[in-house]
Amino acid sequence: MSENVMTLQVITPAGVVYDHHANYITARTTNGEIGILPNMISTIAGLEIDELKVRRPDDETHVDYIAVNGGIIEIKDSLVTIVADSAERNRDIDVSRAERAKIRAEKALEVAKAEKKSDEIKRVEVALHRALNRLNVSSHN
Amino acid sequence: MGASLNEIKTKIASTKKTSQITGAMQMVSAAKLQKAESHAKAFQTYAEKVRKITTDLVSSDNEPAKNPMMIKREVKKTGYLVITSDRGLVGGYNSNILKSVISNIRKRHTNESEYTILALGGTGADFFKARNVKVSYVLRGLSDQPTFEEVRAIVTEAVEEYQAEEFDELYVCYNHHVNSLVSEARMEKMLPISFDEKGDEKASLVTFELEPDRETILNQLLPQYAESMIYGSIVDAKTAEHAAGMTAMRTATDNAHSVINDLTIQYNRARQASITQEITEIVAGASAL
């Protein structure tokens, strides 16, 4: 293994979603976007619902996108671990399902706003955010 | 000889049908067990990682914990999350866990106000209701391969009740799946979260850069940790349930077969007896002439 490579593992309750080498990763933490390079200082941070961009070492143009629903990122000894409730690679995303989830969330948001339930609004907004994120990531195909 | 030929015949036919059904149910449970086992395995990796990150984070400095989920409060009330099945036909699965919960509760508490039950699965909920034990939360109709989303409702409920100081510690009671023949009733303390038991693991010497800060990450990570622990026990319990169902149905099928054997012998004897009787009657009739 060359020195300038790190391993990225994305793990969800349904199993390991992604386990590959990478030489550059961008992720959005609660504090903002970070770029991760091999041999970086050990870090733990919370993630936003957003996309993860992974540059693979085999080819300059080889980039993977992963939709991550929150979770935690841990960087330690060039091993990047992400544990999240759910995560999907762009090629695994079911676009029509994500589309339906988006429409459902939009409708639920209208209802919740009409009824002025602030908890419900927050919850639905997160669901909508997730659906939009999945759609956004799947568009990289 | 009691029963007539016809009666025995119907009995044999009906037992055969029952054995077919139990045989089919055994196969269904076996298939579900296999699925549940692979699911539990996939989840194991997740649980390990969450645990590792939490340990890394907590052991990276020695300040006393400030997070409400880690602070030990004086125990005034204990919550028990009891995982049972919704359906019957799983052998001793339910009675096993309920018996151990009841005996534990009797040992620990003298007063009813000292504990509360959260029931997952209909059998447990009905059991405690019939005994006038207060059940503060019931979740029924969990699917055979519960997803994380499905279980989140009860986990969130448990964590919220804990944070609202409805109870001061939470135990999860479930059947741990050992193998397809053996499961054992377990009672595990989930809240407050403690890392005392991992004394043999060496604390990592790596210091971590924390973004944004320790408390914020803990606030996000600890609920996830608790969720994963509780979800893990639910997955484990479901696996044990399928195993118990499989074993129970196999025993039922075996029993049905032995009943059919006995009945067939009885039937043949009765048939033989009636033939003998007929011959005797004919012979007696002939000699009377």
From Swiss-Prot, chain A:
Subcellular location: Cell membrane
Its membrane topology: Peripheral membrane protein
Main localization (coarse): membrane
Superkingdom, natural source: Bacteria
Keywords of this entry: ATP synthesis, Cell membrane, CF(1), Hydrogen ion transport, Ion transport, Membrane, Transport
GO cellular component: plasma membrane; proton-transporting ATP synthase complex
GO MF entry, a single one: proton-transporting ATP synthase activity, rotational mechanism
Pfam families assigned: ATP-synt_DE, ATP-synt_DE_N
Family: Belongs to the ATPase epsilon chain family.
Record note on quaternary structure: F-type ATPases have 2 components, CF(1) - the catalytic core - and CF(0) - the membrane proton channel. CF(1) has five subunits: alpha(3), beta(3), gamma(1), delta(1), epsilon(1). CF(0) has three main subunits: a, b and c.
PANTHER family documented for this protein: ATP SYNTHASE DELTA/EPSILON CHAIN, ATP SYNTHASE EPSILON CHAIN, CHLOROPLASTIC
Family annotation (NCBIfam families): ATP_synt_epsi (TIGR01216), PRK00571.1-3 (NF001846)
Function: Produces ATP from ADP in the presence of a proton gradient across the membrane.
Name used for this protein in its record: ATP synthase epsilon chain
Organism for this UniProt entry: Lactococcus lactis subsp. cremoris (strain SK11)
From Swiss-Prot, chain B:
UniProt KW Transport keyword: yes
Protein known as: ATP synthase gamma chain
Keywords: ATP synthesis, Cell membrane, CF(1), Hydrogen ion transport, Ion transport, Membrane, Transport
Quaternary structure and partners: F-type ATPases have 2 components, CF(1) - the catalytic core - and CF(0) - the membrane proton channel. CF(1) has five subunits: alpha(3), beta(3), gamma(1), delta(1), epsilon(1). CF(0) has three main subunits: a, b and c.
Listed CDD domains: F1-ATPase_gamma
Species of origin: Lactococcus lactis subsp. cremoris (strain SK11)
UniProt membrane topology term: Peripheral membrane protein
Family: Belongs to the ATPase gamma chain family.
Pfam family, one: ATP-synt
UniProt subcellular location: Cell membrane
GO molecular function, one term: ATP binding
NCBIfam families: ATPsyn_F1gamma, PRK05621.2-1
GO CC, any one term: plasma membrane
GO terms classed as biological process: proton motive force-driven plasma membrane ATP synthesis
Function: Produces ATP from ADP in the presence of a proton gradient across the membrane. The gamma chain is believed to be important in regulating ATPase activity and the flow of protons through the CF(0) complex.
